């Protein structure tokens, strides 16, 4: 089973587009899109990971 991951190397970004492509984080919180999720990953110092694509 391959780990689900997203490349957050280009983040953080100051502004996120309002695209609706939800991701579920390891904190059981739904993030609206990759940008919002990756900003949160950076803020968490890498402790936040992707649980799965789609809403939690």
From Swiss-Prot:
Residues 6-56 form the Kazal-like domain. Pfam families: Kazal_1 (PF00050). Keywords: Disulfide bond, Glycoprotein, Protease inhibitor, Repeat, Secreted, Serine protease inhibitor. The record marks 18-19 as: Reactive bond 3. GO terms for cellular component: extracellular space. Glycans are attached at residue 45. Gene3D superfamilies: 3.30.60.30. GO terms for molecular function: serine-type endopeptidase inhibitor activity. It is found in: Secreted. Disulfide bonds join 8-38, 16-35, 24-56. It comes from the Eukaryota. Avian ovomucoid consists of three homologous, tandem Kazal family inhibitory domains. This is Ovomucoid. It comes from Gallus varius (Green junglefowl).
């Amino acid at each position: 089973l391959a780990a689900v991951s997203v490349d957050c190397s280009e983040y953080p970004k100051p502004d996120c587009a309002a695209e609706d492509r939800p991701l579920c984080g390891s904190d059981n919180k739904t993030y609206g899109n990759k940008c919002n999720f990756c900003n949160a990953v950076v803020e968490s110092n890498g402790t936040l990971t992707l649980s799965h694509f789609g809403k939690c």
